[in-house]
């Protein structure tokens, strides 16, 4: 698969759904990246999944296990926000579950830059005659920015939160501290703090 692959509207739609599933896992995955996936059979979504808390199933396994009639997986397509892992850790490799399931086509939103993966998952799938297409997604790349930085640069991504009033004050005249940011910016700050890399580097 290359960047020259052509994708339909539905391909982009399903990948965006996978991105939304990945967003559900933010702040709960420890040192793992937040990943989401959608399983499709004959243009019908038959399952969805996202990375479970550390030590529990990854997104792909989570989705596959939720399909009660496993025969539906034969010939199905799976849209993964990130390249499926191919190594043993606290869980089995996701590519093994995909290969055994009978899924015949895998769409990937980004390549996992973690050196222990980085294309190995794709290679395993293609070796098993499973078609792989890389549908690069900017939102997914942004979602995994902190994770990639921790694995490639071996250091946390430094983020700073700075706020002041229009007259450059950070407290009232009687020194009482007040919120000077709105609820949206506070929620975004909490989201960044609880991201997987923040958990990984806080110990």
Summary of predicted features, one role per range:
Residues 39-139:
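Zn2+-dependent cytidine deaminase-like catalytic core
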Residues 35-40, 162:
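Short beta-strand scaffold segments in enzyme catalytic cores
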Residues 112-153, 163, 171-195:
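Internal gly/pro-rich beta-alpha loop/helix module
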Residues 193-203:
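Single conserved hydrophobic/aromatic residue that forms the stacking wall/gate
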Residues 1-17, 122-137:
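Short, compositionally biased leader-like segments
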Residues 31-34, 157-158:
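Short, small/polar residue-rich loop motifs at catalytic or cofactor-binding pockets
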Residues 18, 36, 85, 125, ...:
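Residue-level signal for inorganic ion chemistry
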């Amino acid at each position: 698969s290359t960047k020259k692959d052509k994708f339909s509207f539905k391909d982009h739609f399903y990948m965006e759904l996978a991105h939304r599933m990945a967003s559900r896992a933010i702040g709960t995955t420890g040192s793992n990246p937040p990943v989401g996936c959608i399983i499709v059979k004959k243009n019908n979504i038959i399952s969805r999944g996202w990375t479970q808390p550390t030590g529990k199933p990854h997104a792909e396994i989570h989705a596959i296990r939720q399909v009660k009639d496993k025969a539906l997986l034969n010939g199905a397509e799976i849209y993964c926000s990130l390249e499926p892992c191919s190594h043993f850790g606290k869980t089995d490799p996701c590519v093994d579950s995909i290969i055994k399931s009978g899924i015949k086509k895998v769409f990937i939103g980004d390549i996992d830059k973690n050196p222990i993966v980085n294309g190995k998952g794709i290679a395993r799938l293609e070796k098993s005659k499973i078609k792989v297409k890389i549908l690069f997604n900017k939102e997914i790349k942004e979602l995994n920015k902190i994770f990639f930085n921790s694995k490639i640069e071996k250091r946390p991504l430094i983020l700073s939160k700075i706020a002041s009033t229009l007259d450059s004050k950070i407290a009232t005249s009687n020194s009482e501290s007040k919120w000077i940011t709105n609820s949206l910016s506070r929620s975004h700050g909490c989201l960044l703090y609880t991201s997987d890399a923040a958990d990984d580097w806080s110990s």
